[in-house]
Amino acid sequence: MDATSEPVRGAFRISVNGEPRELHGGASLADLVAVLGLAGRKIAIAVNRDVVPRASHAARVLQAGDRVEILEAVGGG
């Protein structure tokens, strides 16, 4: 693995629904979902405007400056 593909190891900042949040290097989208208490909920997530399927959350490693948008499905009528 070359230096350009190494994950960030120290603390870094991302944006979650427009709010700054600090994470530690190697944090995946699944890690973020767990930290936010959203595991198992009906949500849709986009990182830098690209929708990330639930099956890819564990593999999607977050990077400094990523913009994460999380939408939760709400039922009603």
Residue ranges and their predicted role:
Residues 1-76:
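Ubiquitin-like/PB1-type beta-grasp interaction modules and other compact soluble beta-rich domains
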